[in-house]
């Protein structure tokens, strides 16, 4: 087991690692739209979705990977009306064959350390 960390993605704000590599598989912790330079949430749903994927990109890069190595995503949205924007942004990031994906509408994250409308 190897811990993968980068300063180009938000620091863990709890008892977890940014990513863990086991037997060639990289498991990335759920990312929220934090700007790693300020550790503040970015504003606006499109900016939030882009920031989440940029955080994932930086963690992948820290292990010499890119989005072509992603095989599964779980997308959690506070409001599924933003799902089309997620699809639009993912289409600009991923190429066929697309990764497997599950998407969920999650009740408000306000009870968590940092409330947000999107997690991947």
Describe each model-derived feature in a short phrase.
Residues 110-116:
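Conserved small/polar residues in nucleotide/adenosyl-binding loops
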Residues 59-70:
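Phosphate/pyrophosphate-binding loops at sites that engage ATP/ADP/AMP, CoA/4′-phosphopantetheine
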Residues 1-6:
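Short amphipathic
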Residues 18-43:
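RNase H-like nuclease fold core
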Residues 83-103:
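An amphipathic, aromatic/His-enriched active-site/gating alpha helix that lines ligand/cofactor pockets
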Residues 74-81:
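Glycine-rich phosphate-binding loops at beta-strand->alpha-helix junctions
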Residues 47-61:
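Short, well-ordered amphipathic alpha-helical segments that serve as non-catalytic structural scaffolds
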């Amino acid at each position: 087991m190897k811990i993968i960390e980068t300063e180009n993605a938000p620091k863990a704000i709890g008892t977890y690692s940014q990513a863990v590599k086991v037997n060639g598989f990289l498991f990335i912790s759920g990312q929220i739209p934090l700007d790693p330079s300020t550790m503040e949430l970015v504003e606006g749903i499109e900016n939030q979705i882009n920031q989440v994927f940029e955080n994932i990109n930086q963690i992948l890069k820290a292990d010499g990977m890119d989005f072509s190595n992603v095989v599964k995503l779980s997308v959690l949205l506070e409001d599924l009306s933003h799902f089309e924007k997620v699809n639009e942004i993912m289409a600009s990031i991923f190429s066929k064959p697309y990764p497997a994906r599950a998407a969920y509408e999650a009740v408000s994250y306000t009870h968590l350390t940092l409330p947000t409308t999107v997690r991947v």
